[in-house]
Amino acid sequence: MRKANVIKGDMIFQWKYGFYMLYFIIIVIYLVLFSFLNGSVKNTIVSICIYSDPAAMGMFFMGALILMEKSQRIIPSIAVSPVTSREYILGKILSIGIISEIVGIILMVQRDSGNHFLCAVGIFAGSVIFSLCGIIVGTKIESLNQYIIWTIPFEIVGFVPVIVYRIGFLWNERIMLLHPGCSVMQLI
């Protein structure tokens, strides 16, 4: 029950600060852009957008959440609350994962092909990976500028191999599946 309350609290916090409105605007923009595409180009671009936004935006939203909680002095109060650090992190990951999954499914139905179940698994896995990266970076920094700078290495490692893999340069190379992002993209 406590875990559900932590997730609910995080989702209310996200709603209060406009995360859901931002996602709604992003979805509308993507749907308009996707309406101009067709065929394999559309499928590739939709797959990259599913990976980069619902999955990877978890890193940026997680950082924003942690910075807001730091500025409001919420994090020190967790130490004396009955919520464990494991429940706190799990609540963050699941709350971001839920919104990522919803957005990803909306984008996923824009493709002409693909396994929807595996795509949903990939979206959630990507969200978890990038949310954990966001927690790692978010706990080490004090300002938004620091956060943006510290996420650059995560972005390079998380995006460049995946985009190269997805657009076909190394699509048939099984060794690329050792990269967690490429494995997520394979599912998507």
Segments (PLM) and residue ranges:
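Terminal transmembrane helical anchor/hairpin motif
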Residues: P161-I188
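A structural motif at transmembrane helix-loop-helix junctions in multipass membrane proteins
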Residues: G18, F124-V164
